[in-house]
């Protein structure tokens, strides 16, 4: 869906669903706005809302209302305009643990109404306490909480990666992923980390973020100009991450119609002398050059030219 700049009120709500092989129902929710336009609301709206709320607290922003403030419109539409932002962030963060976050959102609201427990939304403490302990029934016939879901997903993630990067392939990347998994288990598990970040003010917020970066780092950070740096802890080698980025560039090149190398902006900034006309016409042939760029080196090493 397109972004919608203005705050158009919600007039009504429509939903439909289909059933997948496991028997689970996948819902699609449509907001009918007062100008009679329709907007498909989904998990993206929840993710963008959380990012928007944290960002606007510390920096100037200019975001379209939908999807960045869709959640505010939903709370207003349901008659909960009094609910504090920190509660809203906590609420949607919880819903994102479910594979059907929008459906979970409406189900919990209905649950609170039926059980006369709407007061749960009055404060962050009451909301977070209720949700952290609230189980939901997974389609596999077992109860799930955000703790069990996180632990299960981390285990599945680790297993998947061990199959993808078996043996000695990308050992630094494997070691870093294990660091992130261990950090998530000890520091992020069973808490609403984004809601907690949102509640932090000024220096405390930046201290927390810097703490995360010092503990686990960020493999590669790229800006719109193609500049790239690494914020990894000192005992990790960023070169493996660059190699993986180059593999991704190759996948983008062979799967699309664009003749440009996906790394050309990066090379133009970091090492402009290594670029030439082949980068925008036939980057595979870069493997024949005397001075090799990252893409050409990958092609040559694997004999793909």
Model-based region annotation:
Residues 1-63:
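Metalloprotease/metallohydrolase-associated module, dominated by Zn2+-dependent proteases
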